[in-house]
From Swiss-Prot:
Active site: 431, 484
Reactions mediated catalytically: Transfers a segment of a (1->4)-alpha-D-glucan chain to a primary hydroxy group in a similar glucan chain
Name of the protein in question: 1,4-alpha-glucan branching enzyme GlgB
Pathway involvement of the protein, from the record: Glycan biosynthesis; glycogen biosynthesis
Function statement: Catalyzes the formation of the alpha-1,6-glucosidic linkages in glycogen by scission of a 1,4-alpha-linked oligosaccharide from growing alpha-1,4-glucan chains and the subsequent attachment of the oligosaccharide to the alpha-1,6 position.
GO biological process, alphabetically ordered: glycogen biosynthetic process
InterPro entries, alphabetized: A-amylase/branching_C (IPR006048), Branching_enzy (IPR037439), GlgB (IPR006407), GlgB_N (IPR054169), GlgB_N_E_set_prok (IPR044143), Glyco_hydro_13_cat_dom (IPR006047), Glyco_hydro_13_N (IPR004193), Glyco_hydro_b (IPR013780)
Length: 765
C-alpha cells in the first residue's frame, strides 16, 4: 500500500470520526485490494477489540489507520453475511456490519419521479422501513437532505451519538443506511451536519410514528401489518358520487371531547396499564382517551346522533396542544397522544363498520419553526422559501412551503395519498386555503412579493392544489376534498381540467357570517336585516358549498353558539334550534362542531372537555334530541340533499316578509319529484293564521317542528298538518293557513293520500 493511499486512509478515517464523511461505503465494508485480496473495514467507535466472523472462523481485526477503523484481510469477497464480535466497555456482542449492505434503496426511477414531483408513493422509499437486505432483517433509513455535509442516524441504538451510524449520500441528495437486526419501536432522529459546521437533530419528515409530546423523536414503525375489514365500504365509496349523498359532519377535537381519570388507565392487551397522557396542566388528574377508547365511546355516540361523517381536527403529529394540531411536525404519523398508528387504523375500521366516514383536517399551507421539524432542515431553506416575504407567516409564527420545488410538492401530494392509502380516510378538509392562494395574505404593503405577473395570486400554490386534487381523485374517486377558503376565489370546486382548483366541496364562510350576524341580533332588529338569511341563495350554486359552524366560531371570546343568541334562556335555546334547522334545510352539506349538538355553554377550550353534564338539563337534552331527529329527517328525505348543487333543488315561496322575519321555501329532488315546504319564523311573536302559498292542493303533514315540546319548545304547531285552501298567494293558487310558533322552523310534506284524521290517529297511537 503506497504512502498516498495510507494518507488517504488516515484522512478518511479522521473524517469519519469528525462526522464529515458523506460516502462511508468508499472506506468501510468489504473492499477489494489491488492484489486481488479483500479487506473488511468496520467502523466501531470506542471499541476495545473487534473480530471478524466469517465462515465459522474468527479473524482479529487491526486498527492501522485509526483507533475506530478495524480491518482484517480475507481471500474472497465476504459478501454481507459476516458478523463482527465487538468488545466495548468490557461487554461483548455480535452484530452484522451495516456497511456490508450496499444495495441502493432508492432506485433510478424513484429518484426521477421524486425529482419531478410525481412519486405518489414516495413514503414507501423515504423514512425508516423494516425490510430484508440479502436475507437479513433490519431497518432501511432514507432521507432527502441535498444541502447537508453529512447525515447520521442517531437514537437509542447508539446512545444518540452521530459518530456511530453515518449515512451514505446517493444521487439527488438522498441519504441511505441499512441497520441490520434493528427492530420496531426504536427511537431515532437524523443528525444533520451542515456545510457551515452547524449540527441539527431532526425528526424524520417521513416518520410513521413519533414520541408523545413533549418528546420529539421518531419511532421505527411498520406500514402494512394491519388487517382491514372495510373492503365493502371502500368499494362502495369509490363507486358513488359523494355530492349525491346526505353528508352531515360532526367536527371534533379528539383530545377535548371527553377526558378520563389518570387513576383509571387504559389496559393493554397483555393486561399492563398504559402510562397516561396528561390532558392538560390546568386539569390535574385528567388523561386523554386512547384511540381504542374513543372507538368504544365516540363511534356509538356519533352513530346514535345520526351523523354521516366525523371530521377530526388535525391528528398528524404536533408538539403543541395549543396549536389545536394545525402546526404539524409529523406529516406521516397520527399523533401518539392517543395511541399507535395501528390503533388509529382500527378506529377508522370501526367507523366504517358502523357506516361512518372519516374526514381529517390537512394543513399543507404552513409549518412551525420547531427545531426538530422541517424548518432550515439541512442547513438551508429546503422546505420553505428563503425570502420571508413569501416564506413566512409572521402573524402565525410559521413558515410557508416552497410549492415551486418539485420535491417539496411531492412530499405534500404523496402525504395526501398516504392518508387515504394507509389509514383509509374518506376525506380531507384543507385548512386556510386563502392563506395559500394570496401572497399578501395578512401582510401589509411592502412585506409581500408579487408573482411573476406582478399580481398577488400565489400561482405556485394554485398549481400545487390542482395537482393534489387531481392525484387524489385519480387514486380515490369517491373521496371528499373540502376547502376552507374564505374569499371569493373563483372555481374552487370546479375540476382542474376546467381550470378550477379541483376540490369537490367548499365551506360557505359567507353563509356562516351572515347567519351568525343575523341570529345575534335582537329579533326586533332582524326585520332590517332580512338579506342576511336570504342572500346566500343568490350565490349558492356558484360552488359546491358545505355549510359549516366550526370550531373557529366558538373560541377567542366569540362565545359558544348558544350564548351568541339574544334574549332569555328560552329564547337562546329556541334561536339555536331554529338556526340549526335552517342550516339542515338550506342547500349544501352540513358540518357542526362538537358541543353544538346539545347547546354547550362554555367556549371551546383545547385543554378542557365538553360540558356533558348539561345533558341532565332538559333544554340541552331537547337540543340534543332535535339534532338527532334532524339528522334522521335529513337522511330520509332526499329533497334535502339530492339536488344540493342544482337550482332545481330549491325554490323560494316568499323571502320578502321582513316585517315578520318569516321566510318560506321548497326543497325538491329530481329523481322521484318529492318536495318539502319549509317555513321559519325568526321572531318571538307567534302567528295563528299565517298564509303560505303551495303549488299543489292536498294535505301537508307537519313532519318537523323545532318548537315541539320534546325539543324544549312551547309545543305550538299545526296538530300534525294542514289541508290546503284555495286561497292564492305567493304566485300559487293554493295555500296553507298555518300556526307559526315563536323562533321556529317547520317542515311540511305534501301527501294527497293522507288526511288530518289519519295523521292525528297516528300521533295518538
Amino acid at each position: 500500500m503506497t504512502s498516498a493511499v495510507l494518507d488517504w486512509m488516515v484522512q478518511d478515517s479522521r473524517r469519519l470520526a469528525e462526522c464529515r464523511h458523506d460516502h462511508p461505503f468508499s472506506l468501510l465494508g468489504p473492499q477489494q485490494l489491488e492484489s486481488g485480496q479483500w479487506v473488511v473495514r468496520a467502523w466501531v467507535p470506542e471499541a476495545e477489540t473487534v473480530e471478524l466472523i466469517l465462515d465459522g472462523e474468527r479473524l482479529s481485526m487491526q486498527t492501522p489507520h485509526h483507533p475506530w477503523v478495524f480491518e482484517a484481510e480475507c481471500s474472497r469477497d465476504p459478501g454481507h453475511h459476516y458478523k463482527l464480535q465487538i468488545r466495548r466497555g468490557g461487554i461483548e456482542h455480535e452484530q452484522f456490519d451495516p456497511w456490508a449492505f450496499r444495495h441502493e434503496w432508492m432506485g433510478e426511477m424513484d429518484r426521477h419521479l421524486f425529482a419531478e414531483g410525481n412519486h405518489h408513493h414516495i413514503w414507501r422509499r423515504m423514512g425508516a422501513h423494516r425490510c430484508q437486505q440479502g436475507g437479513i432483517q433490519g431497518v432501511m433509513f432514507c432521507l432527502w437532505a441535498p444541502n447537508a455535509l453529512t447525515v447520521s442516524v442517531i437514537g437509542n441504538l447508539n446512545s444518540w451519538d452521530g459518530r456511530y451510524h453515518p449515512m451514505q449520500q446517493r444521487l439527488g441528495g438522498i441519504w441511505e443506511l441499512f441497520v441490520p437486526e434493528l427492530e420496531e419501536g426504536h427511537f431515532y432522529k437524523y443528525e444533520i451536519r451542515t456545510q457551515d459546521g452547524h449540527c441539527y437533530q431532526k425528526a424524520d419528515p417521513y416518520g410513521f410514528q413519533h414520541e408523545v409530546r413533549p418528546d420529539t423523536s421518531s419511532i421505527v414503525s411498520h406500514l402494512d401489518g394491519f388487517q382491514w375489514n372495510d373492503d365493502a365500504w371502500i368499494n362502495s365509496r369509490d363507486r358513488r358520487n359523494p355530492l349525491d349523498q346526505p353528508i352531515s359532519v360532526y367536527e371534533m377535537h379528539l383530545g377535548s371531547w371527553i377526558h378520563a381519570s389518570a387513576d383509571d388507565p387504559f389496559i393493554e392487551a397483555d393486561g399492563t396499564p398504559r402510562p397516561p397522557v396528561p390532558a392538560a396542566d390546568l386539569k390535574p388528574g385528567a388523561r386523554l382517551l386512547t384511540y381504542p377508547e374513543l372507538a368504544d365511546r365516540l363511534i356509538p355516540y356519533v352513530k346514535e346522533q345520526g351523523f354521516s361523517h366525523i371530521e377530526l381536527m388535525p391528528i398528524t403529529e404536533h408538539p403543541f396542544d395549543g396549536s389545536w394540531g394545525y402546526q404539524v411536525t409529523g406529516w406521516y404519523a397520527p399523533t401518539s397522544r392517543y395511541g399507535t398508528p395501528d390503533e388509529f387504523r382500527a378506529f377508522v375500521d370501526r367507523c366504517h363498520a358502523e357506516g361512518i366516514g372519516v374526514i381529517i383536517d390537512w394543513v399543507p399551507g404552513h409549518f412551525p419553526k420547531d427545531s426538530h421539524g422541517l424548518a432550515f432542515f439541512d442547513g438551508c431553506h429546503l422546505y420553505e422559501h428563503a425570502d420571508p416575504r413569501i416564506g413566512e407567516h409572521k402573524e402565525w409564527g410559521t413558515l410557508i412551503f416552497n410549492y415551486s420545488r418539485n420535491e417539496v410538492r411531492n412530499f405534500l401530494v404523496a402525504n395526501l395519498v398516504f392518508w387515504f392509502d394507509q389509514f383509509h380516510i374518506d376525506g380531507i378538509r384543507v385548512d386556510a386555503v386563502a392563506s395559500m392562494l394570496y401572497r399578501d395574505y395578512l401582510r401589509p404593503d411592502g412585506e409581500w412579493l408579487a408573482n411573476e405577473h406582478g399580481g398577488r395570486e400565489n400561482t405556485e400554490a394554485v398549481r400545487f392544489l390542482q395537482q393534489a386534487n387531481h392525484v387524489l381523485f385519480e387514486h380515490f374517486p369517491g373521496a371528499l376534498s373540502i376547502a376552507e377558503e374564505s374569499t371569493t376565489w373563483p372555481m374552487v370546486t370546479q375540476p382542474t381540467e376546467n381550470g378550477g382548483l379541483g376540490f369537490n366541496l367548499k365551506w360557505n364562510m359567507g353563509w356562516m357570517h351572515d347567519m351568525l350576524d343575523y341570529f345575534e341580533l335582537d329579533p326586533w332588529f332582524r326585520q332590517f336585516h332580512q338579506n342576511n338569511i336570504t342572500f346566500s341563495i343568490w350565490y349558492t350554486y356558484t360552488e359546491n358549498f358545505m355549510l359549516a359552524l366550526s370550531h373557529d366560531e366558538v373560541v377567542h371570546g366569540k362565545s359558544h353558539l348558544l350564548h351568541k343568541m339574544p334574549g332569555d334562556d328560552w329564547q337562546k335555546y329556541a334561536n339555536t334550534r331554529a338556526l340549526l334547522a335552517y342550516m339542515w334545510t338550506h342547500p349544501g352539506k352540513k358540518t357542526i362542531f362538537m358541543g353544538m349538538e346539545f347547546g354547550q355553554r362554555a367556549e371551546w377550550n383545547v385543554w378542557g372537555d365538553l360540558q356533558w353534564d348539561l345533558l341532565n338539563y332538559e333544554p340541552h337534552a331537547g337540543v340534543h334530541r332535535m339534532v338527532k331527529e334532524l339528522n334522521a329527517l335529513y337522511k330520509q328525505e332526499p329533497a334535502l340533499w339530492q339536488d344540493d348543487f342544482d337550482q332545481y333543488g330549491f325554490q323560494w315561496i316568499d323571502c320578502n316578509d321582513n316585517r315578520h322575519s318569516v321566510i318560506s321555501f321548497m326543497r325538491r329532488e329530481s329523481t322521484s319529484g318529492s318536495w318539502l315546504v319549509v317555513v321559519a319564523n325568526f321572531t318571538p311573536q307567534s302567528h295563528s293564521h299565517y298564509k303560505v302559498g303551495v303549488p299543489i292542493s292536498g294535505f301537508y303533514e307537519e313532519i318537523f317542528n323545532t318548537d315541539a315540546a320534546k325539543y324544549g319548545g312551547s309545543n305550538l304547531g299545526n296538530l300534525g298538518g294542514k289541508p290546503s285552501d284555495e286561497w292564492g298567494i305567493h304566485g300559487y293558487e293554493n295555500s296553507l293557513d298555518l300556526c307559526l310558533p315563536p323562533l321556529s322552523l317547520m317542515v311540511f310534506k305534501h301527501d294527497p293520500k293522507k288526511s288530518l284524521a289519519e295523521v292525528t290517529n297516528k300521533e295518538r297511537a
